[in-house]
Structures are given as structure tokens and as C-alpha cells.
């Protein structure tokens, strides 16, 4: 089986028991809650990627970031003969609510980006049915049982429609 590597940088923002998430519109995590963040651009530092991606996906700048850590998952989509080794850098982030929220880029608003709007989701609602493996890593961390080893998701089901259950 072929394994493809993917590296991304993501923000973890928790307020009053709710996690800042974005709704993925494409890819293996579509129609699930995911963390704001994504791939580095050529020559971009980790925190530069973090700031750019959070701004692009939420419209907010960061007032601070801390606690960098790394996790990884192996995701094999149902019916595919390859898997993606998703390596992720997480930072705890605090959004700058003092400044005005920037308008989301045209690509987010017109649906050509891989994410839609930002939402605050209660941690207890995070299940494999509703959340990406990244969010599940954060949930385990918040429950005091961080998954330090690579987590494998074989036969990952890509959702082709948004779930209507809560």
C-alpha cells in the first residue's frame, strides 16, 4: 500500500468547554468538524502558517499562541489503495477579539476553499461521526489521555452529505 505524507499546522482554541472548529467542505474530513489550520507555503515558518491559516479560515488574528506539540494519524479512505500519514503541529491559540474580524477570503465564501465557516462546538459532541482525527486527538488530550502514538483509521468513511443529527 502506498503511503502519502501530509504535514499541517493547526490551532487549538477552547472557550467555555467549546472548541473552535471549521467545517471541512472537501477531502477526507469533509462534512466533519476540523481544526483551523493547514499546509505550509514554501519557506513559511510554523507560526507564520498558523497565523495565516487561522486568519483565512476564521477571519481572526491571534493575540497569542503557545504549547507547540506534534501528533500523527494514518488515514486510509474506504476503498482506496493508499493511506495518508497526516503529521500535525498543534498550538494553543487565543483569538484577538479586540480587533475587528476580517472578512473571510473569497475562496472560503464561494466554496472553492476546503473549509466553510468557523463554529464553536462542545467537546462532548466530538465523535468520529462528526469530527476529524485532529479534533479527536484534541478531545483525548483534553480528557487527560493524549494519544501520543500514531492512530490508524482504516476504512475511513468520507461523508458525502452533512449529518443532520446532533
Model-predicted regions and their roles:
Residues 1-2, 23, 108-109:
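Short, flexible, glycine/charge-rich loop motifs used to bind or transfer phosphoryl groups or to couple energy/partner
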Residues 40-63, 73-131:
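Unchanged
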Residues 30, 62-65:
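Short secondary-structure junction motifs
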